[in-house]
């Protein structure tokens, strides 16, 4: 049915440039065939109790027509295709705001071509406010606002408080024009107008099919849409749509901007990236390595004395001898050895035996500095400087010139992180040299083997006790 004159409309000069236009054209070809007088879907007027429902057809009619005329074998595929067309507003259920197709006796109606999405509609919030306001003026049960529409109306009324008188006048004028129409024509136009807004202001939770794919939009030469008012409102009282924000006209980039962009992409290319397969392998290997240390996944050794009758754990703690698992864990990485008090002690003893303990003592001193009260920090900074970094220091450490210069400047304003650069440099030196020597040393291997022997002797002793009983 043709649309009334109250809807002012300008020509859509950018219609063919819409990224969704190819889809729209294909859908409209199918809709044109559906509306064919001979081979299309039969449109009828259904008699209801004390009323008539004009120009409708059922959902099962659509599904059967699609199967027959588009050579679709699977009814599910036909239902899916019909749902996509309904979601774009080419036909709609007459009594539901959710635009979907059901293969049953639900009544549907075709949308007027004026409201087709191929017209590149981008309706304004003021248009939506006029529509909702007009609905409140018509005392019809079928025109009552849904909960989400009432919330939208209240929100728009707050947003357009200064313009609301003008919006109310527009809605009142539209309502007067609608009353002059024929009853059947008015019923059809009301449903088509409601379906139009169900597409552009969908029910919460429904997909907005008018949103443009950003990838397709970026390939367009002129991605701007023509902003058109559904009700012919003037530009000075419009507001931007919440789903479509106009893109400001951009100027060609300058040479400096291009240089900055090139520099940015070069930095991005130099960034270290890992494939997901490598990340997954790393996570799996970490899990396999630490699984025996998770008491939820593997029984702890020694067992928890609060849950068992074994007192080995307390005996080991009293003797301050680390368990085999604890010693083995030091070999996973230098961090594991440093965060274990016994591991630090054994590592320090090894370095003292090689007369190279100054690096670890410096690292431990800096860690201790970070935990000191703020009043003690300046004096402690000077002590560390005099012991490890000052000219002629008794335990001088080997720093590169860059780290030494930075630390020299930081000492002038002492703080907890004065030696951060120097500590990081020493950490790398220990990780690449001192720590591997410690793990390969006879001291560590003997400690590890001693724990294994102790465990085997304990197991033999337990076995003999069981056999004797």
UniProtKB/Swiss-Prot annotation:
Pfam families: DEP, G-gamma, RGS, RGS_DHEX
DEP domain boundaries: 37-112
Protein's membrane topology: Peripheral membrane protein
Entry keyword set: Cell membrane, Cytoplasm, GTPase activation, Lipoprotein, Membrane, Palmitate, Phosphoprotein, Signal transduction inhibitor, Ubl conjugation
Domain RGS as annotated: residue spans: 333-448
GO molecular function, one term: GTPase activator activity
Region of interest (Disordered), ranges: 235-256
Gene3D superfamilies cross-referenced by the UniProt entry: 1.10.1240.60, Regulator of G-protein Signalling 4, domain 2, Transducin (heterotrimeric G protein), gamma chain, Winged helix-like DNA-binding domain superfamily/Winged helix DNA-binding domain
The keyword Membrane is assigned to this record: yes
GO BP field: G protein-coupled receptor signaling pathway; intracellular signal transduction; negative regulation of G protein-coupled receptor signaling pathway
Tissue: Detected in retina (at protein level).
Sites bearing Phosphothreonine, chain numbering: 243
G protein gamma domain sequence ranges: 255-316
UniProt xrefs under SUPFAM superfamilies: Regulator of G-protein signaling, RGS (SSF48097), Transducin (heterotrimeric G protein), gamma chain (SSF48670), Winged helix' DNA-binding domain (SSF46785)
Compartments (UniProt record): Cytoplasm, Cytosol; Cytoplasm; Cell membrane; Membrane
InterPro entries named in the record: DEP_dom, G-protein_gamma-like_dom, GGL_sf, RGS, RGS6/7/9/11, RGS6/7/9/11_DHEX_sf, RGS_DHEX, RGS_sf
Keyword Transmembrane helix among UniProt keywords: no
Record PTM: Palmitoylated. Ubiquitinated, leading to rapid proteasomal degradation.
Main localisation: cytoplasm
GO-annotated cellular components: cytoplasm; cytosol; neuron projection; plasma membrane
PTM sites of type Phosphoserine: 229, 241, 434
PANTHER family: LP21163P, REGULATOR OF G-PROTEIN SIGNALING 7
Subunit structure: Interacts with GNB5, forming the RGS7-GNB5 complex. Interacts with GPR158; promotes the GTPase activator activity of the RGS7-GNB5 complex in absence of glycine, in contrast GTPase activator activity of the RGS7-GNB5 complex is inhibited in presence of glycine. Interacts with GPR179. Interacts with PKD1; this prevents rapid proteasomal degradation. Interacts with RGS7BP, leading to regulate the subcellular location of the heterodimer formed with GNB5. Interacts (phosphorylated form) with 14-3-3 protein YWHAQ. Interacts with SNAPIN. Interacts with GNAI1. Interacts with GNAO1, GNAI3 and GNAZ.
Function: GTPase activator component of the RGS7-GNB5 complex that regulates G protein-coupled receptor signaling cascades. The RGS7-GNB5 complex acts as an inhibitor signal transduction by promoting the GTPase activity of G protein alpha subunits, such as GNAO1, thereby driving them into their inactive GDP-bound form. May play a role in synaptic vesicle exocytosis. Glycine-dependent regulation of the RGS7-GNB5 complex by GPR158 affects mood and cognition via its ability to regulate neuronal excitability in L2/L3 pyramidal neurons of the prefrontal cortex.
Protein name: Regulator of G-protein signaling 7
Organism name: Bos taurus (Bovine)
Lineage, broadest ranks: Eukaryota, Metazoa, Chordata, Craniata, Vertebrata
